[in-house]
Amino acid sequence: RKAEPLIDHLEKETGLTIEFIPVTDYAAAVEALVNRKVDMAWYGGFTFVQAKIRSGNNVIPIIQRVEDEKFQSVFITTDSKIKTLADLKGVTFSFGSQSSTSGHLMPRTFLAKAGINPEEDFKRTAYSGAHDATVASVGSGKVQAGALNIKVWEKLSKENKVPEGTRIRVPHTTSSRL
């Protein structure tokens, strides 16, 4: 359903019939484009780099939204003792997908700047596979903290899709600059 307005626009502008092919994750999107199963894909920054490498530099970017120029992530938790990134040492933690720029790569970079190595400093590191799944993992207590794209967090919060009664809060928001 999310793709319908784009499909309608492309069909109107090109006169072509557009078929939407859903994929399960970022890696599947990369493989679909590289193996010419699809003609176009929507990627984040990190996934675009993966596709460019896998394709032998044959992937061409055609559009970028204004908000894609900057990446901001939020770190979330239900633990009231966690107030800074340094307080995350020793917790169970979830990133989103391993191929997510704002759900993995950028949060990992900001953790490193704060002197935190997830493999050494977290009790356990998980990958939820998606931004909303990270919220669900923190909300259910599967992990003590997690990181996700700020726009997804804002949308979930606005639409009341943050699990009720979990008291999930944001102790840290990353800068849009490294």
Spans of model-derived segments:
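Generic structural signal for residues in well-ordered beta-strands
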Residues: 18-20, 125, 168-170
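Bilobed "Venus flytrap"/periplasmic-binding protein-like clamshell domains
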Residues: 1-13, 23, 46, 70-136, ...
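Periplasmic-binding protein-like
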Residues: 66-74, 161-178
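Beta->alpha turn/N-cap motifs
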Residues: 22-26, 36-54, 147-156
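Ligand-binding "clamshell"
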Residues: 51-63, 156-171
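N-terminal, post-signal-peptide region of Sec/Tat-exported proteins
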Residues: 4-38
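Short beta-strand-centered segments that line the small-molecule binding cleft or hinge
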Residues: 39-41, 49-50, 58-72
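Loop/turn elements at helix/coil->beta-strand transitions in domains of secreted/extracellular proteins
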Residues: 16, 37, 57-59, 90-91, ...
